[in-house]
Amino acid sequence: STTNAAGAVYDTYLSNFRNEDGSVNWLPVCADAHGFVVNKDLFEKYDIPLPTDYESFVSACQAFDKVGVRGFTADYSYDYTCMETLQGLSASELSSVDGRKWRTIYSDPDNTKREGLDSTVWPEAFERMEQFIQDTGLSQDDLDMNYDDVVEMYKSGKLAMYFGSSAGVKMFQDQGINTTFLPFFQQNGEKWLMTTPYFQIALN
């Protein structure tokens, strides 16, 4: 339970589901991808190309704005959505040599020193977030958007893209909305999806 891998797991699982010899048996579970849920019907209606990189993503947001449709938003009333957006936009930095070094130290359960944000990885990450806010037209009003607000905008054709779970694709397809899923487009050309387990299972 003192390894980096175990340090990333909720302690209650490690403490309460042990075998008699102290070991823990784990079952792998599926991951839930997070990225951009996209209304393809709106792209086709307004003849706007689906984004393939960061530049075309920004162009799509601007094109939708011109026809009175919101290009992008998310349920930013929840702090975790803000944090996940920052992480997704910063995937390139966090996966760099410096980024991996910072993450290893930050998540090390043996590290007794409080580890804050460093001065190498995070300034660039926050600059990227600031640029993203400007490019997508996010404003103070978006901090009041909850999940229901976003879903209603999307269903009513007032929103083309939002940051969310891949589960949203199936949900909207079942409602007859032609929906697809796009990754985080990095400004360096890379494409990333965030994945998180729905839950973790320990057996004893």
Regions found by a protein language model. Give the residues of each.
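Extracytoplasmic/periplasmic substrate-recognition and gating elements
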Residues: Y46, D135, Q173-N204
